[in-house]
Amino acid sequence: MSGGTPYIGSKISLISKAEIRYEGILYTIDTENSTVALAKVRSFGTEDRPTDRPIPPRDEVFEYIIFRGSDIKDLTVCEPPKPQCSLPQDPAIVQSSLGSSSASSFQSVSSYGPFGRMPTYSQFSTSPLVGQQFGAVGSSLTSFGAETTSSTSLPPSSTVGSSFTQEARTLKTQLSQGRSTSPLDSLRKSPTIEQAVQTASASHAPSAAPVGRRSPVLSRPLPSSSQKTGESSEQRKGELHKTQRPDTEQLRNDNRHDPNKRQPASSAPQPRRGRGGNRGGRGRFGVRRDGPMKFEKDFDFESANAQFNKEEIDREFHNKLKLKDDKPEKPVNGEDKTDSGVDTQNSEGNAEEDDVLAGGVCYYDKTKSFFDNISCDDNRDRRQTWSEERRINAETFGLPLRSNRGRGGFRGRGGGMGFRGGRGRGERRGPPGGGGFGSSRGYRGGSRGGRGGREFAEYEYRKDNKVAA
């Protein structure tokens, strides 16, 4: 496109939608990205045009500025391209360069076509904007400096235009990938400027060129990409910091942070350590590798039943039903078995049935009593203690729901914390004038004992009834 454009090298006056006028030399027009590149650009400000943000003119001369075509309001040609300085068509000439005297004035496209390389990252140490915006580009960018330290070739204008278009595309691609910082609020920005490299004068060396102003149009989508870049840089710093930990943590995290110690994917995996290894071990036990069980023939029930001896099973069952203690029987339910002849007759009449059921021991006789003798405790040698009765009641009826009172009552009934309180009634039955600390502790024990007594009052009532009976 640039080879067939007759305006390449012309002096262009451009007015942006922000009413700011720029003058520079048309370098290239990119139809794909809709951008226009000007060299040796100077900003004349708004020049009394109606705008909400008037901007004064500036004396700085920018090496080049790339404008977005959609933000250009007006574009006029001030001067046609100047004639090229003619060199003799001598095949012996391979390379040539112009002196610094011709750098101030624009001679031809070929005079500024051979660009010098952009200064390296270390030369842009004055501004953080340059460090991230132009430092990452490095030597891939080209500047419009006329003073070149090394001799360069003189390509035709079409070749120069196409090369600058590629550089502009590369610059926009790198900017879209987040190689720019957040917008600087201290600088006035124009919405049409995409990139600007500022210089004090045209004859100044390109290595000392600072960075000019940038456009807020590009700065709008940049914070998200720059934020991603900041996060990735923080992750890289974190990985670098983790690799410099002490040896103990390196041995524990070497597979995670140190890429030099990672095994190739084709090699056999090493045994895992820590909790991950335990999880892996549990996972291996749950896998059945032998497949489902296969049966060759049906189950033979007849041979399995022949292995059982029914007589031995019946004998073992009857032995379990017999009582272990063969002590002489005591009066059951307040009656003696040998008291009346009716009892003897009933026992003789039911002898065969009792022998069949439990080996001659009678556990229930409806003529004597309504209750059976299986769970009777009257034939014991001694009375059961309070703790045994409490345990039996708990097994029979369950534990009370009011656990707090039960726990306090147990402490009170056993004396609890009341040393002088006796059976939990230290305040009433303790020694009079026991004084201060002892009486207070006795009172505490007594209070808890009182609650506990109310909790198990029903159990004591049953026991008293049994004794009375």
Curated annotation (Swiss-Prot):
<dbReference type="InterPro" id="IPR025768">
    <property type="entry name" value="TFG_box"/>
</dbReference>
<comment type="subunit">
    <text>Component of a ribonucleoprotein (RNP) complex, at least composed of lsm14a/rap55a, ybx2/frgy2, ddx6/Xp54 and eif4enif1/4E-T. Also forms a complex with prmt1 independently of ybx2/frgy2. Interacts with ddx6/Xp54 but does not appear to directly bind ybx2/frgy2. Different translationally-repressed mRNP complexes probably exist that contain either lsm14a/rap55a or lsm14b/rap55b depending on the developmental stage.</text>
</comment>
<feature type="compositionally biased region" description="Basic and acidic residues">
    <location>
        <begin position="287"/>
        <end position="300"/>
    </location>
</feature>
<dbReference type="GO" id="GO:0010494">
    <property type="term" value="C:cytoplasmic stress granule"/>
</dbReference>
<feature type="domain" description="DFDF">
    <location>
        <begin position="287"/>
        <end position="323"/>
    </location>
</feature>
<feature type="short sequence motif" description="TFG box">
    <location>
        <begin position="381"/>
        <end position="401"/>
    </location>
</feature>
<keyword id="KW-0217">Developmental protein</keyword>
<dbReference type="Pfam" id="PF09532">
    <property type="entry name" value="FDF"/>
</dbReference>
<dbReference type="InterPro" id="IPR010920">
    <property type="entry name" value="LSM_dom_sf"/>
</dbReference>
<feature type="compositionally biased region" description="Basic and acidic residues">
    <location>
        <begin position="452"/>
        <end position="469"/>
    </location>
</feature>
<feature type="domain" description="Sm">
    <location>
        <begin position="1"/>
        <end position="81"/>
    </location>
</feature>
<keyword id="KW-0810">Translation regulation</keyword>
<dbReference type="GO" id="GO:0017151">
    <property type="term" value="F:DEAD/H-box RNA helicase binding"/>
</dbReference>
<feature type="compositionally biased region" description="Gly residues">
    <location>
        <begin position="411"/>
        <end position="421"/>
    </location>
</feature>
<dbReference type="Pfam" id="PF12701">
    <property type="entry name" value="LSM14"/>
</dbReference>
<dbReference type="GO" id="GO:0005737">
    <property type="term" value="C:cytoplasm"/>
</dbReference>
<feature type="compositionally biased region" description="Basic and acidic residues">
    <location>
        <begin position="309"/>
        <end position="340"/>
    </location>
</feature>
<keyword id="KW-0687">Ribonucleoprotein</keyword>
<dbReference type="InterPro" id="IPR025761">
    <property type="entry name" value="FFD_box"/>
</dbReference>
<protein>
    <recommendedName>
        <fullName>Protein LSM14 homolog A</fullName>
    </recommendedName>
</protein>
<comment type="similarity">
    <text>Belongs to the LSM14 family.</text>
</comment>
<keyword id="KW-0678">Repressor</keyword>
<feature type="compositionally biased region" description="Polar residues">
    <location>
        <begin position="164"/>
        <end position="184"/>
    </location>
</feature>
<comment type="function">
    <text>RNA-binding component of messenger ribonucleoprotein complexes (mRNPs), storage particles that mask maternal mRNAs from the translational apparatus during oocyte maturation. Acts as a repressor of mRNA translation. Probably involved in the storage of translationally inactive mRNAs in the cytoplasm in order to prevent their degradation.</text>
</comment>
<keyword id="KW-0597">Phosphoprotein</keyword>
<feature type="compositionally biased region" description="Basic and acidic residues">
    <location>
        <begin position="231"/>
        <end position="261"/>
    </location>
</feature>
<keyword id="KW-0963">Cytoplasm</keyword>
<dbReference type="InterPro" id="IPR019050">
    <property type="entry name" value="FDF_dom"/>
</dbReference>
<feature type="compositionally biased region" description="Low complexity">
    <location>
        <begin position="200"/>
        <end position="226"/>
    </location>
</feature>
<dbReference type="GO" id="GO:1990904">
    <property type="term" value="C:ribonucleoprotein complex"/>
</dbReference>
<feature type="compositionally biased region" description="Gly residues">
    <location>
        <begin position="431"/>
        <end position="450"/>
    </location>
</feature>
<feature type="region of interest" description="Disordered">
    <location>
        <begin position="144"/>
        <end position="357"/>
    </location>
</feature>
<feature type="compositionally biased region" description="Basic residues">
    <location>
        <begin position="272"/>
        <end position="286"/>
    </location>
</feature>
<dbReference type="InterPro" id="IPR047575">
    <property type="entry name" value="Sm"/>
</dbReference>
<dbReference type="InterPro" id="IPR025609">
    <property type="entry name" value="Lsm14-like_N"/>
</dbReference>
<feature type="short sequence motif" description="FFD box">
    <location>
        <begin position="362"/>
        <end position="378"/>
    </location>
</feature>
<dbReference type="InterPro" id="IPR025762">
    <property type="entry name" value="DFDF"/>
</dbReference>
<feature type="region of interest" description="Disordered">
    <location>
        <begin position="374"/>
        <end position="469"/>
    </location>
</feature>
<dbReference type="GO" id="GO:0003723">
    <property type="term" value="F:RNA binding"/>
</dbReference>
<dbReference type="GO" id="GO:0017148">
    <property type="term" value="P:negative regulation of translation"/>
</dbReference>
<feature type="compositionally biased region" description="Low complexity">
    <location>
        <begin position="148"/>
        <end position="163"/>
    </location>
</feature>
<feature type="compositionally biased region" description="Basic and acidic residues">
    <location>
        <begin position="377"/>
        <end position="393"/>
    </location>
</feature>
